Swiss-Prot record:
Keywords: Cytoplasm, Ribonucleoprotein, Ribosomal protein, RNA-binding, rRNA-binding, tRNA processing. Coiled coil: none annotated. The lineage of its organism: Archaea, Thermoproteota, Thermoprotei, Sulfolobales, Sulfolobaceae. GO terms for molecular function: ribonuclease P activity; rRNA binding; structural constituent of ribosome. The keyword Nucleotidyltransferase does not apply. InterPro entries: eL8/uL1-like, Ribosomal_eL30-like_sf, Ribosomal_eL8-like_CS, Ribosomal_eL8/eL30/eS12/Gad45, Ribosomal_eL8/Nhp2, Ribosomal_eL8_arc. Part of the 50S ribosomal subunit. Probably part of the RNase P complex. The gene is rpl7ae. Pfam families: Ribosomal_L7Ae. GO terms for cellular component: cytoplasm; ribonucleoprotein complex; ribosome. It is found in: Cytoplasm. It comes from the Archaea. Belongs to the eukaryotic ribosomal protein eL8 family. This is Large ribosomal subunit protein eL8. Multifunctional RNA-binding protein that recognizes the K-turn motif in ribosomal RNA, the RNA component of RNase P, box H/ACA, box C/D and box C'/D' sRNAs.
Amino acid sequence: MSKPSYVKFEVPQELADKVLEAVKKAKDSGKIKKGTNETTKAVERSQAKLVVIAEDVQPEEIVAHLPLLCEEKKIPYVYVPSKKSLGEACGLQVAAASVALMDPGEAKDLVDEIVKRVNEIKGKSS
């Protein structure tokens, strides 16, 4: 199955697992915004430290604007394979198409590592 058009780069599974772990830690010790509307607002206000986007969102238009907006605001973003697992990492009973980490809390070191890896994947030097 091919990736949706909004997925701009491939994220290895082990990195996606670290992203979900960071979301869980940030939920418990920092601050996160759940859902695409809240995530979009956090990015527009340049408050997000990291944006997480699920790869299996239908229709794609729900999150298609996020990578471009993140690039424009210079906010790092990363993908995870499943909106269901992203929702669970946020402590929700439902799926989450996207999440913004506002304050990573105890996940700060993990978030820094994720951002560094994402920049390497995207071919940028950090």
